[in-house]
């Protein structure tokens, strides 16, 4: 096994790097084990020759934490960790948990509520023009308009709230390499609209290839039948994507206000 990934600037410079290709921001402590999705993504990128630094549980009140590696050449990768941050923080009765089993010593309060949104916004504040790619369970389950138990309302796609450029859902070790190689070859992230297992936002419906239309965000907020219809279409297309090669070109479109997801 190679060395652990750099977790601070000193370790990055010790490798002779002046700039990483990616900075992975994670709500968990850095655990380099295949039971942790972040480790799989980072090591897969590393095996393809990319330089990856790991920013574990940064202080989300301090933007300088997000600048310690400098601006990554290809982008920030952001996840809440192995578990949804709201499930990690609250019981089903919405009572606050005080321990975090994904933090050394089970110490609580080392990550924010809605970690993907908060980390993404802080990364954007640190470097306004950096590419921001979100993924993991928290992003995957919120990739389109969805009912949020904690707020007891329908929320927009997390890619909107996080102000991210791209969302990778499900198992991302293959799609992240496609993204990385495209960016490395000079393709702008706004043109990555053709990859399976990704979500992007646009104002132009022409960017979606053979779209399957979903009810708009406004419709699913105001009409329970429209919400059920949206979920049903998503479910059928997700099943198709896992069972039929013919479904590879299907694109679900959620009209969220002025944005198309």
Indicate residue ranges for each PLM-predicted region.
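Short N-terminal or domain-adjacent regulatory/targeting segments
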Residues: 1-16
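Hydrophobic alpha-helical segments, chiefly the membrane-spanning helices
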Residues: 253-261
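Conserved small/polar residues in nucleotide/adenosyl-binding loops
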Residues: 242-247
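Two-component system phosphotransfer/interaction surface
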Residues: 171-185
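A solvent-exposed, charged loop/short amphipathic helix patch at secondary-structure junctions
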Residues: 86-112
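Short, glycine/polar-rich helix-capping loops at beta-to-alpha or helix-loop-helix junctions
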Residues: 136-138, 144-159
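Nucleic acid-processing catalytic cores of prokaryotic defense/repair systems
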Residues: 20-26, 33-70
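Short beta-strand/loop segments at the ligand-binding rim of alpha/beta enzyme cores
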Residues: 127-136
């Amino acid at each position: 096994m190679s060395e652990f990934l750099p977790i601070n600037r000193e370790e990055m410079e010790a490798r002779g790097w002046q700039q990483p290709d990616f900075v992975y921001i994670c709500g968990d402590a850095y655990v380099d084990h295949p039971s942790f999705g972040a480790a799989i993504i980072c090591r897969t990128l590393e095996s393809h020759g990319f330089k990856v630094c790991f920013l574990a549980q940064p202080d989300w009140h301090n933007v300088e934490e997000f600048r310690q590696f400098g601006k990554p050449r290809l982008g920030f990768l952001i996840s809440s960790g192995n578990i949804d941050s709201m499930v990690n923080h609250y019981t089903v009765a919405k009572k606050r948990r005080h321990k975090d089993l994904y933090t050394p010593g089970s110490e609580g309060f080392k990550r924010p509520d809605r970690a993907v949104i908060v980390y993404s916004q802080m990364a954007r504040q640190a470097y306004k023009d950096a590419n921001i790619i979100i993924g993991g369970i928290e992003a995957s389950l919120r990739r389109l308009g969805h009912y949020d138990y904690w707020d007891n309302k329908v929320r927009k796609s997390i890619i909107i709230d996080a102000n991210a450029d791209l969302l990778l859902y499900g198992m991302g070790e293959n799609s992240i390499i496609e993204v990385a190689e495209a960016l490395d070859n000079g393709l702008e992230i706004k043109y990555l609209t053709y990859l399976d297992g990704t979500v992007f936002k646009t104002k132009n419906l022409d960017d979606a290839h053979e779209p399957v239309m979903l009810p708009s965000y406004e419709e699913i907020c105001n009409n329970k039948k429209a919400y059920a219809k949206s979920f049903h279409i998503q479910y059928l297309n997700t099943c198709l994507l896992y069972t039929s090669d013919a479904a590879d070109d299907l694109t679900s479109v959620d009209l969220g206000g002025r944005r198309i997801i």
